Amino acid sequence: MSIFNLTEEKMKGTSSTFTAHEIYQQPATWRKTCAQLAACKDELQAFIDQVVKQDDFDIVLTGAGTSEFVGNSLFQALNPKYDFKVKSYASTDLVPSPENFLSRTKPTLLVNFGRSGNSPESLGNVEAAEVVCQNLYHLFAVSYTHLRAHET
């Protein structure tokens, strides 16, 4: 197999196999994600509306590595749409000091991007947010192909 005109052997020799495969599969992953979002649009909107129809709220996008990049990318489009109440933080910033990023009292929608949903970063985000936030809603985008919503 060849990716980016590099043979599998050449990629192994430069320790680039994982990265090359990760980049190569992104277009297909995003197509699947868009299709899934379209299929459950009404359900997702109803869940999100529980938060955004309140007088004040925060939407916090978070993830690590490429998952953080997803949140940062969506931030540009979502922040103006939601009256500049959207934030995007790296899990590595949020987990050790959630009180510096999360409101104790505002309704907060935590959108957690991750590959498996079981990484230390993903689990840490949830645990940290649950300690700080009294009115928390979770939306998990796992592997960018599975979405789960949960209210705590």
Segment roles from a protein language model:
Residues 1-46, 50-53:
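Cofactor-/ligand-binding subdomain signature composed of acidic, glycine-rich
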Residues 53-148:
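Glycine-rich phosphate-binding loops that contact phosphosugars or nucleotide phosphates
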